[in-house]
Amino acid sequence: MKKMKILSFFILSLAIIIGIVYSRQCDDKCKQDYPYSSCNGNLNLYRGLGYDGNGNVIFSGKYNSSQGSGGFGLPSIFSVPSSGGCQLSKRFDIQGEILDGPGYTALDYFYKYLPQLDRYYVRFNQRGSPIFSIYNQTSNEIKAVFNIFNTPFVPAFSQNESAPFFVYGGYGIYGLAKYPTDRSDAQQAKLIYQSQIVNGLEIDGDQLYMTTYQGQFLKGSLNCLNCTKDQLQLLVTDSELASATSVSGFALTSDYMYFSYSGGIKGYPKNGDASRVRKLVSENVVAMISNGDFLYYQTDSGVVKSVSTSGNHPQVNILYTPVSDNQCQCSVGFSGDDCRQCDNGMVLWASDNGIPMCSPLNSLGKPKTCYAAYQCGSSPFIICNGTCTCLPGFSGNDCTLCGNGGEVIWENGYPTCVIQIKKIIT
């Protein structure tokens, strides 16, 4: 069986310090200075939730602009108390988005937060390819882990961080006795079950629970190695699960397994007893996680809620409803009262929405982020791939060095570094 195909991709490790996002109370001046500044509209939540082990639900999002269409500024990680109260706290901004050009990179999904490691697993859209990544909030580094393009990728993490185990579904189910941190980890993963494609996956001790596109709830073992999928135990089949366009979440409690979809949240006992099926909520759910006897979920309108799984009458509690914080923020990298200061930086303009960004210059006078090659200077040896980069084979500050004894071949005004391989005759 083939393991999940890991394609080569640009962002192996990217640390881009774009700058501080300045904010103040929204006023008429803020609106007049658009697009250099904007009053925040409602917070647009990205799909996915996490739990910090300290009574807070975590999610990601970006404020919409009240003047233009779409998001404005940097995306951020937020949290709200799981007990309710709608007290939103911003944990940190996420640097490194490149919203135009060949290096396009944008956050679009929140997978998991590991509190002991203080590690955030997220997904970036990088030039049309979804990248399963780690974001380091201390170094502002995006660390790409797996390229999951054209793969039915479903991750699952062991709850005990002291005994880490990671399982993922692709064209088969694979396991790692660690939490992944590098793209090479996919090559080290062991095949647990052949060919099985899932849309939900969870670890419970040394057992695996999963859902399929055919509406099946299956149970397996982490101790299996290269097992065939017919060795999985069928627990129950659900017609709504089979007909769902997509399963947005799969979660376990002490005695039940639940899935979320456009029709709500539904669950069965872990033994598959269909007579004890439960329908907790009946609204469009786009993300769901569990903690103890509570499920936390996100609706298609961005509302974050909790529902108790104990008792005969589930209690739903609203944790957060997307609203504006009435703040004015400068466009990324800009500062000053009119949000037009771009100190030691280059102004880049996004072609789709006309929003400027101030990209700091590096020690060579090149922007740390670029949208097009001309922003990197007039040298034909330098291209823009999100950052100003030497052409393949070239190196040096001006990118004119051609390997060890290489020859520069020019064609139609473009250089190519050609390394001659000499045969040694014995």
Swiss-Prot record:
Report the record's disulfide bonds. C330-C339, C342-C358, C370-C388
Induction (free text): Induced by srfA, during development.
Q: Which residues are glycosylated?
A: N64, N136, N160, N226, N385
Report which superkingdom the organism of origin falls in: Eukaryota
**Keywords from the named record:** Developmental protein, Disulfide bond, Glycoprotein, Laminin EGF-like domain, Repeat, Signal
What does UniProt give as the signal peptide span?
1-23
Give start and end of each Laminin EGF-like domain: 325-348, 384-408
In its UniProt entry, what is this protein called? SrfA-induced gene K protein
